[in-house]
């Protein structure tokens, strides 16, 4: 029985999106560095990361360094998800569809998305505390919240993990059937 393959158009699409995931990950990393290191952008970076609008914040060099470190945790998790997606897409572009390793890669992508959904609220809360800890007494904030987008990411990550597990199992069953025939 011949190995199922991906049509050429989809293989090209997988290769292109794979390149886009790598470019996106690098862009996010560089943008995060720039937002925290370019002085006129730091206020915007701090407010976006901490989910603050008009509340007073205190940005010192040490707060900037810690803010960069905390936001880098979130960016590292996002980069891991994008890198995993890239590896999965390259397998698909090569025609490795119904194989155990493809299911494992899909499951890893789901885990990475779920991890990003878990890290995002924590980094937001930490950044909120960091940028307000230098405020006058009574104006230090810590906000811990989970947005509907974060919940959807967690759900999608979980579903992708499950589909990856099913695909890995299906590939093993297909291999067993090939050996019988």
For the regions a protein language model found, what residue spans apply to each?
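Juxtamembrane "helix exit" motif at the C-terminal ends of alpha-helical transmembrane segments
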Residues: 29-48, 123-134
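Alpha-helical membrane-spanning segments of integral membrane proteins, especially the hydrophobic core
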Residues: 12-20, 56-72, 100-117, 144-156
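Transmembrane alpha-helical segments in integral membrane proteins
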Residues: 69-91, 158-172
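Hydrophobic alpha-helical membrane-insertion segments
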Residues: 20-36, 107-124
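Cytosolic-side membrane-entry/anchor segment at the start of a transmembrane helix
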Residues: 1-33
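Perimembrane loop-to-helix junctions flanking transmembrane segments
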Residues: 43-60
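Alpha-helical transmembrane segments of multi-pass integral membrane proteins
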Residues: 116-181
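Cytoplasmic juxtamembrane regions at transmembrane-helix boundaries
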Residues: 7, 82-105, 175-181
């Amino acid at each position: 029985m011949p190995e199922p393959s991906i049509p050429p158009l989809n293989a090209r699409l997988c290769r292109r999106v794979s390149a886009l995931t790598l470019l996106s990950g690098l862009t996010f990393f560089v943008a995060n560095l720039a937002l925290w290191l370019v002085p006129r952008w730091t206020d915007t970076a701090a407010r976006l990361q901490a989910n603050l609008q008009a509340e007073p914040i205190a940005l010192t060099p040490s707060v900037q360094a810690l803010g960069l470190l905390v936001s880098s945790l979130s960016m590292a998790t996002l980069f891991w998800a994008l890198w995993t997606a890239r590896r999965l897409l390259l397998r698909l572009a090569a025609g490795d569809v119904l194989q155990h390793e493809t299911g494992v890669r899909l499951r890893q992508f789901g885990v990475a998305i779920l991890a990003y959904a878990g890290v995002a609220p924590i980094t937001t809360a930490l950044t909120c505390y960091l940028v307000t800890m230098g405020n006058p007494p009574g104006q230090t904030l810590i906000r811990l919240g989970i947005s509907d987008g974060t919940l959807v990411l967690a759900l999608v990550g979980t579903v992708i993990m499950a589909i990856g597990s099913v695909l890995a199992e299906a590939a093993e069953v297909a291999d067993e059937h090939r050996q019988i025939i």
